[in-house]
């Protein structure tokens, strides 16, 4: 049986939060309080834009988050003058995460280049892979054993 958007996003959220905790001696992180259904509904009405389902589920877990010393940021949506809504920044070097107002598709832009993602969960997977690479740099090839000892196996 296929998982719901809520289940997929909750799993990704939990994994990212645990991964950030695992790396917390080297990298700061913050997951702020969640938004409410009412805040989400009000934002959608005020902006006449429907947030993609997975993004709504994310905001019901955290309204803003900074991972890996602000390298990965996902924040409350900001409408720009284009056909896109800004929801994050990557690396801190000018790469920004958006979703299309029309299609709801997620993409990043950097120096005029566009990288598309299948879903918001794919964005979170991309971040997760980076955090796992950081764990290997810090703890070595056996980082998963240390992770499992500390947090239990997934």
Name the predicted role of every residue range:
Residues 131-154:
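Acidic, proline/glycine-rich low-complexity IDRs
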Residues 1-103, 152-154:
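A surface-exposed partner-binding patch
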Residues 69-71, 124-126, 134, 142-143:
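Short, charged/polar low-complexity linear motifs in solvent-exposed/disordered segments
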Residues 111-137:
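Compact, glycine/acidic-enriched structural inserts
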Residues 102-112:
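Intrinsically disordered, low-complexity regulatory segments enriched in Ser/Thr/Pro
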Residues 36, 62, 82, 108-109, ...:
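Residue-identity detector for threonine
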Residues 95-97, 107-108, 116-118:
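Short helix/loop capping segments that flank catalytic or ligand/cofactor-binding pockets
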